């Protein structure tokens, strides 16, 4: 039987990966997390796992063989708060823990598929997996970049040592702006779609940043990716153990925040039997409102991201990605069902 470890198992991406594994009939899953934030258990309650282990004790036990033969580790556990300023906390959680896990995987012969981040690019305007374009704007992005750099050294810059079987499969996914079910515990770090859904329910309108960084109001652009697509690509690499490397995981399509807001509002209007409106009509009706760009984010904000998918596609992974209109509409319907 295939035994799999998922860290950050009660988190957003981790719980969705377990759901994807369960859909394949894979239930021998050891879930690793820290449930100090107890309400995260809801992300696990509907899933099939064989064990739960607290993150504080797992890594040493795993390295010493306590869990038998592990096929693969999906490493989603991290501090993902880009506004966290405690560098020691961030480096301990995102870098040192990841290094320890990599070393344990090497010792136990387990494959490692881990969460990196588009935050590694920071202020760059090119989003390709190349050190020339890696310019993190915060310690979160740096913590993710440092582990990517460590994997390049351990596996060879082109991961030839992994491909040759000397390290086993090692794959890093540079997640762009992920949204979808089971992110409710993330607070301020939950997706724009999540916050706008609840804002519209409470206030009857959604708010976007006004013009900033050379972009018109609401026209700042991000590569928004639906969680189902993130899971599908993770599982594609799980199915292809001979493929290693660091890969962007976005849609390859930048869309403005206006698209997200319009999709949220129109999806909610549709659920109440109202017709969809264009952006101009939504703003004229006061359903979308623009607010001044906050000083606290100046110099720390990515106004544009778009994943270069050349490396991902070169592996043979041809998974199609949902656009904002499709993904957000599906997500809003799911959120509405949870509220009903």
Curated annotation (Swiss-Prot):
Pathway of action: Nucleotide-sugar biosynthesis; ADP-L-glycero-beta-D-manno-heptose biosynthesis; ADP-L-glycero-beta-D-manno-heptose from D-glycero-beta-D-manno-heptose 7-phosphate: step 4/4
EC number: 5.1.3.20
Residues that, per the record, bind NADP(+): 12-13, 33-34, 40, 76-80, 93, 144, 178, 186
Species, as recorded: Albidiferax ferrireducens (strain ATCC BAA-621 / DSM 15236 / T118) (Rhodoferax ferrireducens)
Job description of the protein: Catalyzes the interconversion between ADP-D-glycero-beta-D-manno-heptose and ADP-L-glycero-beta-D-manno-heptose via an epimerization at carbon 6 of the heptose.
Protein name, as recorded: ADP-L-glycero-D-manno-heptose-6-epimerase
Family of this protein: Belongs to the NAD(P)-dependent epimerase/dehydratase family. HldD subfamily.
GO biological process: ADP-L-glycero-beta-D-manno-heptose biosynthetic process; carbohydrate metabolic process
Catalytic residues, chain numbering: 140, 186
Gene3D superfamilies the UniProt entry points to: NAD(P)-binding Rossmann-like Domain, UDP-galactose 4-epimerase, domain 1
Free-text note on domains in this protein's UniProt record: Contains a large N-terminal NADP-binding domain, and a smaller C-terminal substrate-binding domain.
One function term, GO molecular function aspect: NADP binding
């Amino acid at each position: 039987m295939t035994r799999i470890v998922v860290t950050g198992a009660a988190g957003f991406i981790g719980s969705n990966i377990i759901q994807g594994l369960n859909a394949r009939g894979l239930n021998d899953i050891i879930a690793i997390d820290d449930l100090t934030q107890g309400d995260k258990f809801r992300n696990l309650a509907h899933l099939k796992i064989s064990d739960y282990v607290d993150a504080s004790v797992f890594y040493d036990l795993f390295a010493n063989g306590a869990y038998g033969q592990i096929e693969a580790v999906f490493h989603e556990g991290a501090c993902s708060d880009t506004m966290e300023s405690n560098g020691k906390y961030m480096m301990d959680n995102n870098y040192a823990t990841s290094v320890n896990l990599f070393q344990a995987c090497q010792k136990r012969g387990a494959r490692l598929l881990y969460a990196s981040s588009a935050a590694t690019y920071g202020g760059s305007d090119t989003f390709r997996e190349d050190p020339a374009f890696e310019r993190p704007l915060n310690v979160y992005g740096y913590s993710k970049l440092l582990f990517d750099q460590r994997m390049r050294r351990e596996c060879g810059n082109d991961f030839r040592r992994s491909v040759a079987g000397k390290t086993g499969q090692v794959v890093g996914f540079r997640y762009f702006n992920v949204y979808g079910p089971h992110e409710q515990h993330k607070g301020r770090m939950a997706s724009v779609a999540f916050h706008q859904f609840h804002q519209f329910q409470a206030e009857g309108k959604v708010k976007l940043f006004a013009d900033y960084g050379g972009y018109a109001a609401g026209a700042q652009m991000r590569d928004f990716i639906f969680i189902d697509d993130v899971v599908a690509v993770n599982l594609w690499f799980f199915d292809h153990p001979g493929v290693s490397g660091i890969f962007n995981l976005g849609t390859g399509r930048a869309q403005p925040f206006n698209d997200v807001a319009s999709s949220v509002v129109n999806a909610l209007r549709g659920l109440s039997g109202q017709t969809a409106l264009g952006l101009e009509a939504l703003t004229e009706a006061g359903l979308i409102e623009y607010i001044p760009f906050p000083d606290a984010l100046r110099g720390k904000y990515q106004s544009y991201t778009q994943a270069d998918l050349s490396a991902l596609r070169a592996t043979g992974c041809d998974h199609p990605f949902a656009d904002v209109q499709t993904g957000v509409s599906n997500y809003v319907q799911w959120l509405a069902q949870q509220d009903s």
